[in-house]
Regions:
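Mature N-terminal, pre-catalytic/accessory segment of carbohydrate-active enzymes
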Residues: 5-261, 335, 633, 681-703
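"Short basic amphipathic alpha-helical interaction patches in structured regions
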Residues: 106, 269-270
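Eukaryotic long, low-complexity intrinsically disordered regulatory regions enriched in serine/proline
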Residues: 366-374
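Carbohydrate-binding surfaces of carbohydrate-active enzymes
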Residues: 22, 34-36, 40, 55-57, ...
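Glycine-rich loops and low-complexity Gly/Arg-rich segments
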Residues: 116-118, 371-372, 587-588
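Secretory pathway export signals and precursors
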Residues: 4-5, 542
Length: 703
């Protein structure tokens, strides 16, 4: 049977975790120069000598094509074997939504296209291309005629348009903004005639005759781009590539920022497109028994007096986008689990690290649900999201990929993350574009020094408690996805921008409350529950896509207090979760309207609810603690860890903390971790006193 995302099921392979030391991964940008004269051998020797990394993630960039076996198979086989001999694991970085984005093969002249920068690798089977829809509206003239023109938009510059195709046309009588008179809607797609067309635009005529004179018309135009659609083509490309590397000593795939084709609305008009592909349409028709083109129209218009049609259509589109992005992630994880003994499943789907950015479009902000053992984020992801992602992971550790051309920014990321059970995924050796390339000194030596110092915490944190979290913030994904019917709330990325969920989480964090942010899809997944008087967050089940809910085989993170932001349009299981917890006396407050479910049917919440966000009021209502400390993290059992730039400067950092009624004073020289009844874990020269009493002599912990 052909392997597609319509049918994904492989046997699970158990995870084997050895030792207490956490992996130290680094992206390695592999370009044409890397392959020339086996430069990668020298690069591996350099990385072994000058970094603390133990996982290499080669990333094909300019001049290389990840799926070109003639170019990549032999070098990757030798690269992986030599790296393994030098003590590295190798996980190939992948990108399947934009084939050839950085490649430069001969450009097919038949396309007659022009593009700035490196020439792209054109998709051979254009039925595999991803499309964005463009809505074109007009009015039929006195003879029932209209000519409508559509032009490709919202694509990033290097993702070039390949062709345009009219998908559907409807005529109706408008009954106000976004409504039509019931009974007036007619599908006239069979009458569409393309009269002008190139790769970027097309003109479509409708000539319906005098009976249609003056009626409104809606054209759903599809513009297909040089990007693989996600339902079948992306996984097929992944499988072909990794099957081609079957004889290379790889340890997994770094599935980086995967999802739908990237879009662009940063400087221009707001994004109002929808994704379309022929494979996706087939899934809607066969599995969901739905006319997908009609659903795309229903997302824009509803019969007068029945706004629920539009609400349901928007929610259904978003729900399926969630499913298919996760189906691809599950399929890639299943492939690795079936073929590698202990794959390093990585990495993040944070794209621009914001719920109110194109992350919402590209992968539905699925950060918390990726089938990984560790939690992955990147760059400037806010702390409540970082904490929520790591607490929902199996290993209860996170990685934040980071790059900058400023060394101090990189040092700061490593230092700030470490107390919170987060390590840096370094980016990138041989980086010629985004940040430093790990050949600069003293930068590279300093990063190695930081990595080695932070490893003192590995064993301490593995054996210890989780970060003390004052409040769990859960937001309603459908409320965030669906602005309708409030036009004023409609954001640049076609989401509900009025909720400002991240701003609220940041406000709580800056007020000193340790807050973890999660979406309510974790309730749907069976991972967030109320049990034994607390909210329990179970880890992602490392198993097949067939039954991800079954393997709750690792202990959950537990929270006493929860604030639910905006339950409108939530699924019934979420309403049951909220009302069930409230009935059992949970410390729970709901913020915002609580009136409708995902199908626009009536719903209600019987517990404590406030109409608007008011942190002071909510903090008083729930008696929220403020557990943040400067330069470190307090854990659930009262233990704590501190990390500072003293690792590099040699200047001791002063300690003066009050935790659980005890006062801790002294100083540390970069890393210090304390747990009652255990020897102090710290860098040399550190001293710690508890209520004036010396707590003991520091000893380095075993990584």
């Amino acid at each position: 049977m052909k392997r597609t995302l319509l049918n994904v099921c492989l046997a699970a392979v158990p995870l084997a975790v050895g030792g207490e030391g956490l992996p130290v991964p680094i992206v390695w940008q592999v370009n044409a120069k890397t392959l020339a004269r086996r430069q990668y051998i020298k690069d591996i020797d350099y990385l072994r000598a000058h970094t603390a990394a133990d996982i290499l993630s080669p990333a094909p960039v300019e001049g290389t094509v990840q799926g070109d076996m003639d170019q990549m198979r032999a070098p990757m086989r030798e690269l992986a074997a030599y790296a393994r001999a030098k003590g590295f694991r190798v996980a190939l970085r992948t990108d399947y939504s934009t084939p050839g984005f950085f490649a430069a093969p001969a450009f097919p002249s038949a396309h007659g296209l022009s593009v700035k920068g490196p020439l792209p690798n054109i998709i051979k089977d254009q039925a595999q291309a991803q499309a964005l829809t463009v809505d074109v509206e007009g009015r039929l003239d006195g003879t029932g005629y209209a000519c409508l023109r559509s032009e490709a938009k919202w694509n990033r510059e290097k993702i070039i348009p390949l062709y345009a195709k009219p998908l559907a046309a409807y005529v109706f009588e408008k009954a106000g903004a976004g409504f039509y008179r019931p009974g007036s809607l007619e599908d006239v797609s069979a009458c569409m005639r393309v009269v002008a067309q190139d790769n970027r635009s097309m003109s479509v005529e409708l000539d319906l005759g005098a009976p249609y004179a003056g009626k409104d018309v809606f054209l759903l135009a599809g513009h297909f781009f040089n990007a693989l659609e996600i339902y079948e083509a992306q996984y097929a490309d992944f499988q072909k590539t990794f099957d081609g590397f079957a004889d290379a000593a790889l340890d997994g795939a770094v599935n980086d920022e995967q999802g739908f084709m990237p879009v662009d609305a940063w400087g221009g008009e707001p994004f109002r497109g929808r994704y379309f592909s022929f494979a996706g349409e087939r899934y809607w028709r066969e599995a969901l028994k739905t006319d997908f083109r009609r659903l795309l129209f229903d997302m824009r218009y509803a019969p007068a007096g029945d706004a629920a049609v539009r609400i349901r259509a928007i929610n259904r589109y978003f729900d399926e986008a969630r499913r298919v992005t996760m189906a691809f992630e599950d399929a890639v994880a299943d492939y690795q689990l079936a073929r590698y003994s202990d794959p390093f499943l990585a990495c993040h789907s944070t794209y621009h690290n914001s719920l109110d950015s194109d992350d919402f479009i590209k992968n539905t902000c699925n950060y918390w649900s990726l089938p990984r053992d560790y939690g992955f984020t990147d760059e400037g992801t806010i702390w409540p999201i970082r904490l929520g992602v790591l607490l929902g992971s199996k290993m209860k550790f996170g990685y934040n990929m980071f790059y900058s051309k400023n060394p101090d920014d990189v040092y700061g990321n490593i230092i700030d993350c470490a107390p919170w059970r987060i390590r840096e995924f370094h980016h990138a050796y041989n980086d010629g574009r985004w940040g430093l390339g790990y050949t600069e000194q003293p930068f590279t030596a300093n990063v190695k020094k930081l990595d080695e110092a932070v490893r003192l915490l590995d064993g301490f944190q593995r054996r210890g408690a989780l970060p003390r979290t004052d409040v769990l913030l859960v937001f309603g994904e459908f409320a965030h996805a669906n602005w309708y019917p409030d036009e004023k709330a409609r954001g640049k990325w076609d989401q509900n921008a009025s909720l400002r969920i991240m701003e609220k989480a940041q406000e709580a964090w800056r007020a000193g409350h340790v807050a973890a942010l999660l979406p309510d899809r974790l309730v749907e997944e069976g991972r967030l529950r109320f049990e034994d008087g607390a909210f329990a967050l179970y880890p992602i089940a490392r198993t097949t896509a067939c039954d991800r809910r079954a393997a709750f085989n690792a202990p959950p993170a537990r929270f006493r207090k929860l604030v639910f932001l905006y339950p409108r349009y939530a699924k019934r299981c979420v309403w049951d979760f909220l009302n069930g917890a409230a009935a059992k006396g949970a410390a729970l407050v709901v913020v915002g309207p609580a009136d409708l479910d995902v199908n626009a049917e009536k719903a209600s919440f019987a517990g404590r609810r406030v109409a608007e966000w008011d942190l002071a009021k909510i903090a008083a209502e729930l008696q929220l603690a403020s557990s943040r400390i400067p330069g470190g993290c307090v854990y659930e059992d009262g233990s704590f860890a501190l990390v500072s730039d003293a690792i590099l400067t040699g200047r001791p950092t002063k300690i003066d903390l009050a935790i659980d009624g005890r006062r801790f004073t002294g100083h540390h020289t970069g890393v210090l971790a304390f747990r009652k009844g255990e020897a102090l874990v710290a860098t040399a020269g550190s001293k710690l006193f508890c209520d004036g009493q010396n707590v003991g002599t520091p000893r380095p912990d075993r990584p």
